[in-house]
Regions:
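Short, Lys/Arg-rich, polar N-terminal cytosolic tail immediately upstream
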Residues: 1-23
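Cytoplasmic membrane-interface segments at the C-terminal ends of transmembrane helices
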Residues: 15-25, 82-98, 138-148
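N-terminal signal-anchor transmembrane alpha helix
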Residues: 22-46
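Hydrophobic alpha-helical transmembrane segments
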Residues: 26-34, 70-74, 98-103, 124-128
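Membrane-water interface at the C-terminal end of transmembrane alpha helices
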Residues: 28-32, 36-37, 132-148
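Alpha-helical transmembrane segments of multipass membrane proteins
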Residues: 35-44, 80, 109, 133, ...
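Membrane interfacial helix motifs at helix-loop boundaries and amphipathic/re-entrant anchors
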Residues: 40-73, 110-128
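Core segments of alpha-helical transmembrane spans in multipass integral membrane proteins
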Residues: 66-85, 100-108
Length: 148
């Protein structure tokens, strides 16, 4: 009775990919950022139609929130998602941690617009925009995590 050596040998198995390929990471991030910008622009249009001024008091001088400001406001989300994806290559649980941190930062950032010296419509619209960007970050990281 002979023992098959191939059945008893131990082979090193390559570990599974920790995170999605970079192409997928970039696509998920860009799509989430673009979706956030479009939804925030819709919120801005709805707020303007409802009478929100989108004028904030910036140390005594008025600052008007424009459409380009909405685009620029998504850059922290893009950097955060890419950083979480990079860290997720090292440890997979960091993707989920990135989702939690992104969601919490969005919730905490709502305090800024709510405490701003401006009209109520502007406060509500800006707070909603902060939440939209947070949801986009969480969704992008979920798409990246599921692709892993």
């Amino acid at each position: 009775m002979s023992v098959d050596s191939s059945a008893t040998s131990t082979r090193s198995v390559r570990p599974a990919r920790v995170v999605a390929p970079w192409r997928h990471v970039l696509v998920a991030t860009v799509v989430a950022a673009a979706a956030a910008v479009v939804v925030c622009w819709v919120v801005m249009l709805a707020g303007t139609a409802a009478g929100a001024s989108f004028v904030l008091d910036d140390r005594g001088s008025p600052h008007v929130v424009r459409a380009v400001d909405v685009v620029l406001a998504t850059w922290p989300m893009v950097v955060g998602v890419l950083l979480a994806a990079l860290l997720g290559r090292w440890r997979a649980w960091l993707l989920r941690a990135g989702q939690v941190v992104g969601g919490l930062l969005a919730l905490l950032s709502v305090a800024g617009p709510m405490l701003a010296v401006t009209d109520s419509g502007t406060r509500i619209a800006l707070a909603l925009m902060h939440l939209v960007v947070g949801v986009a970050a969480v969704a992008a990281l979920e798409a990246i995590r599921r692709r892993a």
